[in-house]
Amino acid sequence: MYTDFYKLNRNPFEITPDPYFLYATKEHKEALAALYYGVRQHKGFVVLTGEVGTGKTLLIRCLLQLCKGSDIASAYVFNSRLSTLEFLQYAATDFGLSATGKHKGELLHELNRFLLVRHQKQLTTMMVVDEAHHLSTEVLEEIRLLTNLETADEKLLQIVLVGQSELSDKLDSHELRQLKQRITLRAYLEPLDFEDTKGYIQCRLQLAGASSGTACLFPDETIARIHHFSRGIPRLINTISDNALITAFARQLASVSVGIIDEVADELRLGVGRSRSVCVFQTTKGADQTLSVGQSLLQLRHQY
C-alpha cells in the first residue's frame, strides 16, 4: 500500500513479533543476557515480565533463535490456558516425546528419563512458558515440581516464565511462595523513553529499506507525539506509526505531521497513562554477557 510510495521494501510497523526488526535497547540486551546466562548456568527458574506490548515475546523468540542449533533443546509453551495434564502433554510433545493417551505419572517418567539422558550427554534442556500470567496456581505448582527433577549438583530442566506484570503479583501469593523462592533471576522490560522511541522508529524504517531521505518521514516533533500517545510501548508505536503512514499516503504527503498523529490517536481512542516503573535485575555475570549477546543479535538479524 504505502510501501511503494515511500520506497520501502516491506512494512516497517507490523505488530507480529519478528526478530529481524528487533531494536535492542540497553535494557533489552541486559534482559536477554540475564535469561541466556540463567539457562546456560542451569539456574533453574528465570522470570521475564513487562507491560502489554513491550516486546517480551519478541525477546523470547530471539532467545530461542540464539539457542537454536546449539546444545540447548527447547520447548515453547505459548498456550497458557491449559490443565495440568494438558500442560505436561504439550511440553512433552514439544520436546519430541510421545504424549498421546499417557497419564500424568507416565508423562513425568518420560520427561525425567529424557532429561537424564540429555544431562548424561552434558546437554542443556530449556522450557519457555509464554503468557504465564494466565497459568492457574495448580499448573504453576506443577511447574515448580518439575524443578525437582535434578541431580545432586544441578537442575535438569531450565524454566523461563514470561508474562505481564500480573505474573509477579501472582508469584508473590502465599500459595506460590515455594516457587518464588526458587526464582534465581528476574528481568523486566520497561517502556521506551523518547530517545529509544526515536531510535526504534528510525531503525525499523531503515530495516524496511528506507533511504536517508525517507528516514525523515517522522520529524522529531512527530516522534515526540507518538511517544506521548504510545507511552513508549512498542506495540502501540507500531500501530500509531502504521496508521499514520496510511493517512499520509492517502494525502500524498512526504512526511507525517503532528496533526496526523493526533487524528490517529483520536481514532484509536488512545489515552495517556503512567506506566509502571520497575528496575531490571540481573547478576553481574549476566551483565558480562551483554556484549556477546548484542553481537549475537546482529548475527541473528542476518538470518532473516
Predicted regions and their residues:
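Conserved AAA+ ATPase "SRH/arginine-finger" region at the nucleotide-binding site
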Residues: 77-81, 171, 184-197
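C-terminal helical "lid" subdomain and adjoining coupling/linker elements of P-loop NTPases
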Residues: 20, 152, 210-283
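Trafficking entry modules
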Residues: 2-13, 18, 23, 256-304
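Conserved NTP-binding/hydrolysis module of P-loop NTPases
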Residues: 8-13, 72, 82-101
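Short regulatory helix/loop adjacent to the ATP-binding pocket of P-loop NTPases
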Residues: 64-67, 167-182, 191
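Mid-core helix/loop region of P-loop NTP-binding domains shared across ATPases and GTPases
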Residues: 83-84, 99-142, 151-154, 193-197, ...
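Walker A/P-loop nucleotide-binding motif
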Residues: 41-63, 80
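Sensor-1/coupling segment of RecA-like P-loop NTPase cores
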Residues: 47-52, 58, 106-110, 134-139, ...
